[in-house]
Amino acid sequence: MGVIQRLDTHTVNQIAAGEVVERPASIVKELLENALDAGATRIDITLAEGGKKLIRIIDNGCGMAADDAELCVERHATSKIRRAEDLMAVQTLGFRGEALPSIAAVSRLVITTRRSIDNQATRVRIDGGERYPIEAVGAPPGTTVQVEDLFFNTPARRKFLRSATAEGSACAEVIWRLAAAYPHVAFSLTQGKQISFRSPGNNKPLETLSAVFGREIISFLLPLSAVAPDGWTLRGFIGSPSLHRNNRNHQNWFVNQRWVRCRILSQAVEEAYHGMLPGGRFPFFVLHLELPPQTIDVNSHPTKQEIKFDRERDVADFTRQTVLQTLRSRPLSRPLWSLASFQSDGAPPTQQLSSDVREKAEGERWRQDRILLYREGALSPTKQELPKSPERSERVERLNSGDFGQGRALYRESSQELPTDCLRESLEETESQSESIRQCLSENLPLHRQEPRAEKECQPVEGLVAGDVAEWIPIGQFRRSYILAEGGDTLYLVDQHAAHERVLYHGLKERYLNEAGVCASQQLLLPVTVTLTPAEFQGAMEAIAELRDAGLIVEHFGGNTLLIRAVPVGLPPGEEKGFFRDILNSLMKGLRDREVIRRAALSSMACRGAVKAGQVMSHAEMGALLQQLARLEGVDTCPHGRPYLLRIDRRELERRFYRS
């Protein structure tokens, strides 16, 4: 007798079920897709023990006739396709005819279904693959699928299931993802005796996203919509750069209404966010991509969660450019990090001050005196002797004596703007600024001020328009790394390296990109050699064009060594190797878009040319840096995405000190 034998039907069904039914969430996904394909507008899901004991899904879809109900549990029986060619143009979520027979093989399955034109419903019951006679019963139009005792006949698989809580969470994740894709469908999830999730089903995407992700994120969402010449459509919402996560769990792609995992598309979105997010953080988005069905392959993965495109690179470029354009056109407001957002202690809230009117008047007098003294140089920590005047002496005396009482510390924001030229006048008196800051000051970039948006609910909780930074008064340095500045009722902490990095990046972008968008290069008098690993060398040789876009001209020098003959204009001397490795690392991570590479090159140049942490800055240099920040278009991070601003509100300080 031969070694190879034909397996019996029961074993074949068990193997097939293992490919489709991995856990309760797999069943929920398959059954929900069937309900959506049936045109349901309301779907109710009930779970017991996370789906291990019971999964019940009730929909108001089209239902099935008695003959179809009996046939639907046969393997590879489906209404979605008729021949192999249909696989390349399938527009439904399900099409293989594997889900129901696979579920029936490892559970106790009951299907009750009725069409609206039928007088009675049909009930199909199967226990572990064993069929029972078909029954005629009474039921409303639609379909109810009940799955009990999952893996009751395969205890070896049942023991690998996780806790009821973990399995229930996985089921809920499947439900809210489909709810986000189908805002016109009302989903409800009941676990135990409580409804844990419900979507409105009113075809309003923002209300659906609010139900799924929480109302607090809505103000950070940016609507996105674009149509490519090929007819591709991209729509949905992306998070502003201030809304980011420590993993990719909140990245949701729906291609032709199907939730998928797509590395190439997610990478395209992340490339668009390059330089806007801190390291190790990922953007939030819910995006819908509509393509002709024949241009994608949805049958390339056992669970249909991964797809293939016939023009993958073009789709990725379309996605990246659309997201980048949306980010660039967002309102120029700066959501700032607040001290309150980092705390979780139980200190009592500060009571409302009883002397607000008096303090406002006193504080405003103190504030105006401080501005005038700063303009005259009296508050600058320099040893230069300044000419005295009776008026200025009186103001200094009032400030130092504390005659204004609490108003000195509790002055309120005035409706009058701080003159934007006061810092500039102080800068003109001092010639000891750092060269890089002075060069950026000479550009005379225009100030920008963004008017508040009409829809209050769409604004960030904390906002700062670009021109407001010009009103800040530098106080000093902390640990030679952070600039302390005051403005209005707020104390600001500025990371000097990250802030200067952003300033230099802005200047480099305008100064060193030629008309073709390529970083201008300068030949090195003495070329620099750099030795690479075999993998790095191979990657560098395959990316010669991208390196040239970044301003680097290299050639092979033997073995795994390259010769750097030219670098971008403005790169500080001695930074050639480090800059080259920065760009090569970006290329090795898969960044191939030329615009992204150019941005990475400018980011590296700005980082290497910026003032470093631990470096002493004069009062004039701090003021110069704040003035340059005021000229930026509402950006609150360094080019690598790290925030450079932290605010401490006056009331937060009062709460910390238990002021009443």
Swiss-Prot record:
Composition-biased stretches (Basic and acidic residues): 385-398
Disulphide bonds in the chain: none
A GO term from the CC aspect: mismatch repair complex
GO annotation terms (biological process): mismatch repair
A Pfam family of this chain: HATPase_c_3
GO molecular function: ATP binding; ATP hydrolysis activity; ATP-dependent DNA damage sensor activity; mismatched DNA binding
Annotated family: Belongs to the DNA mismatch repair MutL/HexB family.
Annotated organism of origin: Heliobacterium modesticaldum (strain ATCC 51547 / Ice1)
Keywords: DNA damage, DNA repair
Chain spans, region Disordered: 341-362, 378-398
Biological function: This protein is involved in the repair of mismatches in DNA. It is required for dam-dependent methyl-directed DNA mismatch repair. May act as a 'molecular matchmaker', a protein that promotes the formation of a stable complex between two or more DNA-binding proteins in an ATP-dependent manner without itself being part of a final effector complex.
SMART domains: DNA_mis_repair (SM01340), MutL_C (SM00853)
Ranges of biased composition (kind: Polar residues): 341-355
Protein name: DNA mismatch repair protein MutL
PANTHER family: DNA MISMATCH REPAIR PROTEIN MLH, PMS, MUTL (PTHR10073), DNA MISMATCH REPAIR PROTEIN MLH1 (PTHR10073:SF12)
Record Gene3D superfamilies: 3.30.230.10, Histidine kinase-like ATPase, C-terminal domain, MutL, C-terminal domain, dimerisation subdomain, MutL, C-terminal domain, regulatory subdomain
Gene: mutL
